[in-house]
Regions:
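N-terminal leader/linker segments that initiate helical-solenoid repeat arrays
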Residues: 1-50
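General structural concept
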Residues: 30-80, 86, 90-93
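Amphipathic alpha-helical repeat scaffolds of TPR domains
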Residues: 8-14, 47-53, 57, 83-101, ...
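Structured C-terminal portions of repeat-based eukaryotic scaffold domains
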Residues: 25, 179-288
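Alpha-solenoid helical repeat scaffolds
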Residues: 27, 31-34, 73, 107-111, ...
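Flexible helix-coil transition and linker loops at the boundaries of alpha-helical arrays
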Residues: 2-3, 37-48, 74-86, 110-120, ...
Length: 288
């Protein structure tokens, strides 16, 4: 027999769930809310919004994607202006769905916020979609430029925007410009280090992505400093160790290639030289 609940019971559950989530006891939150949602008929829609909002927080931490998908959809229907729930529901669902529907969700969510850093984050996520899911759309390139420019208009000193600009320029095969944007990104990152509000995992991913792009362009000049900083955050990260190994491998390959071609051992190539005529392939295939 299903348990019966009163409005007072619901209020108590909301309070308990807030405590559970604060203490990172997310499974307890799910255990409290699941039976409530299956048997209680909410007369007060705001109570349901509060319940679903707390439930969503726990589901995200437990990575229960199917439930996250269903709850975010319901929350958007019940509270489209995010008056009583976290507006991130739009962006979470957008990440799950992707494509044109994902872009619509990002834009709808942006309408509810004024924080420029968060808006830029959403614009860059839209650029991501156009560079992946929608890369074959006829206007994909124009849309990328549009949202990158919108991001710069909001904050021309945002280091992540320049990282995305570099990636976009690689897709256009404008390799020299790409390198300049990556250098600008790393410079801005260091200049604003004290005020950057990002999770350690996101900062590490930024560092690792930047290293990958620089390796792709054959420019090793910044990689030591990026690796040094990332090691301060986490010195035994598998991805970081792999990238450091590949960096040393490529550096040695380039030196041997230079020696074999009677060029100064430390000669460095421009991105255009490195990518031209598959020189990068010749260097990587050179026997040690």
């Amino acid at each position: 027999m299903a348990k019966s609940y009163t409005d007072d019971d619901v209020l108590v559950i909301i309070e308990k769930c807030n405590i559970n989530n604060t203490n990172k006891q997310y499974k307890k939150t799910v255990k409290l809310i699941k039976p409530l949602l299956s048997s209680y008929n909410f007369n007060d829609i705001n109570l349901k919004i509060l319940i679903l909002d707390g439930y969503l927080q726990a589901l995200i931490e437990l990575d229960l994607i199917e439930d996250i998908y269903n709850v975010t959809q319901e929350l958007i229907q019940l509270d489209p202006l995010s008056k009583n729930s976290n507006n991130n529901k739009y962006f979470i669902l957008a990440q799950i769905i992707g494509g044109k529907k994902g872009i619509d969700l990002y834009l709808n969510g942006i309408n509810n916020i004024t924080n420029s850093d968060k808006i830029i984050e959403c614009y860059l996520s839209i650029v991501d979609i156009y560079m992946t899911d929608l890369c074959f759309e006829v206007d994909a390139e124009q849309q990328c430029e549009l949202y990158l420019n919108k991001s710069l208009e909001l904050n021309s000193q945002n280091f992540m925007v320049y990282s995305y600009l570099g990636s976009f320029k690689i897709s256009q095969q404008s390799f020299g410009n790409a390198l300049e944007f990556f250098k600008k990104s790393w410079s801005l990152f260091n200049e604003n280090l004290g005020s950057i509000d990002m999770d350690k995992s996101k900062i590490l991913q930024y560092c690792y992505n930047l290293i990958k792009f620089l390796l792709e362009l054959g420019d090793l000049s910044l990689i030591d400093s990026i690796l040094s900083y990332s090691k301060q955050l986490e010195d035994d990260n598998i991805e970081g160790l792999y990238l450091e190994g590949f960096y040393n491998y490529l550096s040695l390959k380039m030196k041997l290639f230079n020696i074999n071609n009677n060029v100064d051992i430390n000669y460095s190539y421009t991105p255009d030289q490195f990518m031209e005529n598959e020189m990068n392939v010749h260097i990587l295939n050179y026997n040690i």
